[in-house]
Amino acid sequence: MSADSSANLPATLKSLPADMELVLKVIPMPADCNANGDIFGGWVMAQCDLAGSVIPARYAKGRMATVAVNEFIFKQPVRLGDILSFYSKLVRIGRTSVTVTVEVFAERFRAQGEYIKVTEATFTYVAIDDDGRPRPIEKT
């Protein structure tokens, strides 16, 4: 392999983020594949939304809704058999909203113990009342 082609390979990591919380771990199944045989991006987005909601739920202490996908980047394809680890970190707490980042790492089926960042995203969630209207988040 030439030096030029190795520059296009994703960087493999031996460890996962220490400054973020593991909020979800999942293995995609064959039903989650797209027409190319990779995992469908919409499935990855849905899992990121679920993972992203874990930290805001602690602050909302009640109903909440996703109000924005501020950023979403697919860095590498997710493959059948990958073990996906979703890490999240608090970015900001507003009056009614919580913003978090989510980073997704794949442990490839044939490369156990090595991780590749496949997705990164930023989500904003808003605390809502029983009528679906924004409500203040209690500061603790």
Positions of predicted regions on the chain:
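A positional/architectural concept
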Residues: 24-26, 30
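Small beta-barrel nucleic-acid-binding modules, principally OB-folds
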Residues: 61-77
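Short histidine-centered beta-strand/loop micro-motifs
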Residues: 35-38, 57, 76-77, 113-115, ...
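HotDog/MaoC-like acyl-thioester-processing domains
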Residues: 3-6, 12-14, 18-24, 79-83, ...
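Active-site helix/loop of acyl-thioester processing domains in fatty-acid/polyketide metabolism
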Residues: 42-62
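A conserved, well-ordered hydrophobic junction motif at loop->secondary-structure transitions
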Residues: 31-46
